[in-house]
């Protein structure tokens, strides 16, 4: 019987979650969906001092926004302490761990001596029981840690789905602390128990965990388990070539939503940030799941490219429905000084979005470009002097009169403009520029007939006539 694929995303809720972090959710999610398996969310919150509920909320919100639904969880490590203690007791009973009374000061001094001798700093096994070995007397008043009896010889090996065959000599590994003096278990121990209990078959995570892997494999095997398939993803770099982080200016996942990016664009971009399917750059979520495999995960660090994300987002904005985009654009108007009442009184927002979306890289940009439809024009004096000249005023007056009478369609407006140009022997920019300026307050708009149609006859005519009065 084939074992069902079970993957997991196991973030620590200690603050910021950026694109590099959430990629470690996207790939295991996609693999689980591709293999018709199970995707588990586990919150590794044993760092009590740094873990916050706000960070948990940010993780859940980011996953929900990107559509990374999980089948089981969220499981919180702090709620599994009884289970960890049960396994620790089992390991003590089986002689897999031992009490170590070496103080932090003694350990620091030991490591310093090793460094001075040119040796790799490591615990020397002072308190490790061995046949015929006499252990020191436990010092009074010292709470011991629990250390795992790592194998003394042999190698730990695994075939990493990204990095290939990795072999680590057990002589390189010291006996890991798996429970602190107060009895609380450590990270590497909790991860192993969780992966075992949750029957995780594939661990897809950042390559900053590679050094933890041999230790985790040894603990896993001591508990009678078999290692999952590991796929260690190379780091995501920012545009300056540094590891992506808040300190180096990375934006949070939800920051992209708040900047006007569409979730499907971010998912598409993230998918290509360390994985490829031939030369395909644009693909749907469904296509991504169908194509995704571990064999085509990149082996080199991926570098974030903001221009490429903007290009992808512009593509998805063009493809998106106008009603949806209008709703997504609404929250951005408040920051532009435009309230709901002003939106209601101005041009139809859905139609405005339809006109402007082909020129925008973000939904926020759509709102910024749409603002002219919802507030009074305020052209600068220099532009007025340049474009609204005495020579063009008669043409503006005739155009206003013509627009009062025509059917209010884009074609009829275009015909009125063309007739006015012919009557006054003007070129289109000579008339369109002042009209744009007087009606919209700017010379930068899409096609003049489309813009005027959305402003509406009353607004267009009154603004031109007011300027001529």
UniProtKB/Swiss-Prot annotation:
GO terms assigned for molecular function: ATP binding; glutamate-tRNA ligase activity; tRNA binding; zinc ion binding
Major location category of this protein: cytoplasm
Cleavable signal peptide: none
GO CC annotations, alphabetized: cytosol
InterPro entries: aa-tRNA-synth_I_cd-bd, aa-tRNA-synth_I_codon-bd_sub2, aa-tRNA-synth_I_CS, aa_tRNA-synth_I_cd-bd_sf, Glu-tRNA-ligase_bac/mito, Glu-tRNA-synth_I_codon-bd_sub1, Glu/Gln-tRNA-synth, Glu/Gln-tRNA-synth_Ib_cat-dom
Keyword annotations: Aminoacyl-tRNA synthetase, ATP-binding, Cytoplasm, Ligase, Nucleotide-binding, Protein biosynthesis
Domain of life according to the entry: Bacteria
Region (Disordered), start-end ranges: 114-139
Basic and acidic residues: compositionally biased ranges: 114-131
Assembly: Monomer.
Family: Belongs to the class-I aminoacyl-tRNA synthetase family. Glutamate--tRNA ligase type 1 subfamily.
UniProt-listed NCBIfam families: gltX_bact
Job of this protein: Catalyzes the attachment of glutamate to tRNA(Glu) in a two-step reaction: glutamate is first activated by ATP to form Glu-AMP and then transferred to the acceptor end of tRNA(Glu).
UniProt-recorded name of the protein: Glutamate--tRNA ligase
């Amino acid at each position: 019987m084939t074992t069902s694929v079970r993957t997991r995303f196991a973030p620590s809720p200690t603050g910021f979650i950026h694109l590099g972090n959430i990629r470690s959710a996207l790939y295991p999610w996609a693999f689980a969906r591709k293999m018709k398996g199970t995707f588990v969310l586990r919150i590794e919150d044993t760092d009590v001092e740094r873990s916050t509920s706000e960070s948990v909320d940010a993780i859940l919100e980011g996953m929900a926004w990107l559509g990374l639904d999980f089948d089981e969880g969220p499981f919180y490590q702090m709620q599994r302490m009884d289970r960890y203690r049960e396994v620790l007791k089992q390991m003590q009973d089986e002689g897999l761990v031992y009490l170590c009374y070496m103080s932090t000061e003694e350990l620091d001094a030991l490591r310093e001596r090793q460094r001075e001798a040119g040796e790799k700093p490591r615990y020397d096994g002072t308190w490790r029981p061995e046949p015929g070995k006499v252990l020191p007397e436990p010092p009074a008043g010292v709470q011991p840690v629990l250390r795992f009896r790592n194998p003394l010889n042999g190698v730990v090996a695994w075939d990493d789905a990204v990095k290939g065959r990795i072999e680590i000599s057990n002589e390189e590994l010291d006996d890991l602390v798996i429970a602190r003096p107060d009895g609380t278990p450590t990270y590497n121990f909790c991860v192993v128990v969780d992966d075992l209990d949750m029957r995780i078959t594939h661990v897809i995570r950042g390559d900053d965990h590679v050094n933890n892997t041999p230790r985790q494999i040894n603990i896993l095997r001591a508990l009678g388990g078999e290692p999952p398939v590991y796929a260690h993803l190379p780091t995501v770099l920012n545009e300056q070539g540094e590891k992506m982080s808040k300190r180096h200016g990375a934006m949070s996942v939800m920051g992209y939503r708040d900047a006007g990016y569409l979730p499907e664009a971010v998912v598409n971009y993230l998918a290509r940030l360390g994985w490829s399917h031939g030369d395909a750059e644009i693909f749907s979520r469904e296509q991504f799941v169908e194509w995704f495999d571990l064999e085509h995960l990149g082996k080199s660090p991926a570098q974030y490219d903001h221009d490429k994300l903007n290009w992808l987002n512009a593509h998805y904005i063009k493809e998106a429905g106008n009603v949806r985009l209008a709703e997504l654009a609404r929250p951005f108007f408040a920051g532009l000084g435009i309230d709901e009442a002003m939106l209601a009184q101005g041009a139809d927002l859905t139609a405005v979005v339809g006109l402007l979306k082909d020129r925008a890289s973000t939904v926020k940009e759509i709102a910024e470009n749409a603002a002219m439809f919802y507030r009074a024009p305020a052209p600068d004096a220099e532009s007025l002097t340049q474009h609204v000249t005495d020579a063009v005023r008669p043409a503006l007056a005739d155009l206003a009169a013509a627009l009062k009478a025509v059917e209010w369609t884009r074609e009829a407006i275009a015909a009125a403009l063309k007739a006015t140009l012919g009557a006054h022997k003007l070129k289109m920019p000579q008339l369109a520029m002042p009209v744009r300026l007087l009606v919209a307050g700017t010379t930068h708009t899409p096609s003049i007939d489309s813009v005027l149609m959305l402003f509406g006859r009353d607004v267009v005519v009154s603004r031109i006539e007011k300027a001529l009065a």
